[in-house]
Amino acid sequence: MARLNPSKPSSRGGKPRSSSADAMAEHKPPPGRPKREGEGASKKKAKSGGFESMGLCEEVYRGVRHKGYRVPTPIQRKAMPLILAGHDIAAMARTGSGKTAAFLVPMIQRLRRHDAGAGIRALILSPTRDLATQTLKFAQQLGKFTDLKISLIVGGDSMESQFEELAENPDIIIATPGRLVHHLAEVEDLNLRTVEYVVFDEADSLFSLGLIQQLHDILHKLSDTRQTLLFSATLPQALADFAKAGLRDPQIVRLDLDKKISPDLKLAFFTLRQEEKLAALLYLVRERISSEEQTIIFVSTKHHVEFLNILFREEGLEPSLSYGAMDQEARNIHISKFRARKTMILIVTDVAARGLDIPLLDNVVNWDFPAKPKLFVHRVGRVARQGRSGTAYTFVTSEDMAYLLDLHLFLSKPLRPAPTEEELLKDMEGMNLKIDRALANGETVYGRFPQTIIDLVSDGIREVINGCTDLIALEKPCTNAFHLYLKTRPMPSTESIRRVKDLPREGLHPIFRDVLGSDELSALAFSERLKSFRPKQTILEAEGEAARGSNQWLDVMKKKREVHEGIINLVHQKNNVDHEPKEELVENISNWERKDVCGNKRKLQSFRDEEYYISSVPQNQHLEAGLSVRANEGFVENRLDAAVLDLVDDETSGMQAQKTRYHWKKNKFVKLNSGDRVTATGKIKTESGAKLKPTKTGIYKKWQQKTHRSIDTGRKYGGFAEEGASTTGSHQRGNRKHTAAGRGRRYIPNADVPSEIRNPEQIQKSRQQKAMDIARMKNRSTKESKFQKFQKNNRRHDGPSKDGKFQKNRRPDGNGKNRRPDGNGKGRGKGKGNANGFGKGKGKMKGKGTR
């Protein structure tokens, strides 16, 4: 019995009901029941500019209210209307501003209901597993009142379980590029041509050189009519790096350019040596950070994660940890414990720097200074979210000072050193008031970590390390890994390297003002003066003068030093004079004498009209350089690439030759696109750092044979339907689908699927065909049995007899013996017939017999 379709026209000739009418009838409350909160929210137009004014359907609006949103954030208010209108956008806003909801809410509003025959309709790509898992949970919460199916495709999980999810025809896929490329190579039936909505979350990280090959394979399988969205907290203004994303007339939304980090975030930079970081970290965790506050610690390598994990456990602290090569189940367990506040410390690498949203996070500690300014923004963006305050502690060594200057050029924030101990002893109240005003104005103050504290904590750490064999075994791998990290990180800018040499000496950081008293400050000032002490005599002179008193050789050394000091002072005076203004040299000279000095010709002077002056360097040069996708390679490679001028050849052969590059390992020329790099083995690098070949391994076929299921996402069927219609509001006439609204035509999957209901003629024809096939098979089996019987009898014939008839004899030689009854052995005997059973002869004969 066929199921009634409410969207079909009635037999009375009435007009078909549209999908919007069905939705209104479905959600209309029964009489006598008051409306629930949020019911009919898509109709009313609130003046407050909330989600009610965006035209969301009831299911989506209820999900938004259930999540706790009341008023959209600036990025949501700016981007969501453009997305709902169908525009491609590239959006940038600082971390914690609600970018995830800005693309999830329009996606759920567009899809609304599950459609098993439409295939995959939305694809969200994330650079890391943690970010993809977080996006999945967020999408499930927003789509709680819809029946949309969402699938998570990330590395670390079993392929078979992901095959099960794909076989259920999900509407939305949230994936990492490496695992999705693996599925595309493994499953031939997996089709992405039906995708209408594509989101690149953290787009600048996705389009970096590490993942560009995977994205190229994915984008090649997408439809050209898709809607493409780029979201990131650090997105450059020039979209040339995202040319392969296929943006069509994109709308650029960039908010909070002057506030790249939260204004509620406090920054603290401590200068110290590399070997002092352990003591400084333990002191911060124990003394400065409350036990009720959650802290995330960023380190450079996974070896440092393991080392700090064991050290903290030896000290009585239980941390959670996460890094790229860690098992996915273990990562989920550690992150879940940290979210549930069972542990208060999380030690991670930069795999958790992007997009990881942990509620109620209070502090961030940067063990190693990030080499890229935007990486620092992503790290510290984990705290001070949604109106909460937080603190970011950063350790800075002497090699990291140039990166510190680059960071503040990117943030457009002034940087000043903390006052020295001598300045504090002279005017402590005035210096403290000056520092407080600088911090209130948004300036960054960096200073030293107290040496007395480091000395006290370092002794205890050394005892713990010497008593633990695991820590001793991890010391050398940590050192080697850190050296490799220093070699591979990008170089800072040349200007910052030059400016570091002119920076003044910093004092104690203001955060430790309440720790040290005036006596300790005096001791620190004395120790700092000892560091700058330079004796006037060499050790030989001092010992000689103490032993023998004044003599001729000591007098010669003193006279030599006096002469040299005079020359040195003259050089210093000359350098100081060169830096003074030239006008001071002729200040007291008459006009006539001035002409002799300066000349009669007027000198060329510099003049700049600020209103009409056009600089050769853009004002936001440091900002865009830090936001650039190619910034991962450092400033040197960017400048070299910008200085190269490639002229396109005027012949086809020359154009093709320009796109090829000789590969040393493959021993041939390979074809490259713009921005692509040569890979030695053709392997792809996943988000965990593992390398694998995107080739078919046969695991999908094994899963098919085991479960007798397959993945079919609309690869075989597809058609066109009218523009503006959805699959839920369409009706079917014959083998075509028609919609209720719109005159244009657009591609809708499975629109031309033939009906499976057969008429009596088709049933009769199929039965006749089946009967004919059965009769043909019976006839064939009868003929085969006769032929087999004939062959069996023919094996027993040994040859013709005298009268020409075949005589049956199981001995192929006629009369002799045969050791192999099947006729393949050697036969001996007398009589007529040879070893094959057909010839004539007398005497003994040898030969191979055949059947």
From Swiss-Prot:
Keyword Hydrolase: yes
Span of domain Helicase C-terminal: 277-426
Compositional bias segments (type: Basic residues): 733-746, 841-851
PROSITE patterns (alphabetical): HELICASE_ATP_BIND_1 (PS51192), HELICASE_CTER (PS51194), Q_MOTIF (PS51195)
Ranges of biased composition (kind: Low complexity): 7-20
GO cellular component terms attached to this protein's record: cytosol; nucleus
A single GO molecular function term of this UniProt record: RNA helicase activity
Keywords: ATP-binding, Helicase, Hydrolase, Nucleotide-binding, RNA-binding
SUPFAM superfamilies attached to this UniProt entry: P-loop containing nucleoside triphosphate hydrolases (SSF52540)
Sequence motif DEAD box, location on chain: 201-204
Residue intervals passing through the bilayer: none
Every Helicase ATP-binding domain range: 80-253
Top-level taxon of the source organism: Eukaryota
EC number: 3.6.4.13
Binding site for ATP: A93, R94, T95, G96, S97, G98, K99, T100
Sequence segments annotated as region (Disordered): 1-49, 702-851
Description of its domains: The Q motif is unique to and characteristic of the DEAD box family of RNA helicases and controls ATP binding and hydrolysis.
Family recorded in the similarity comment: Belongs to the DEAD box helicase family. DDX54/DBP10 subfamily.
Name listed for the protein in its UniProt record: DEAD-box ATP-dependent RNA helicase 29
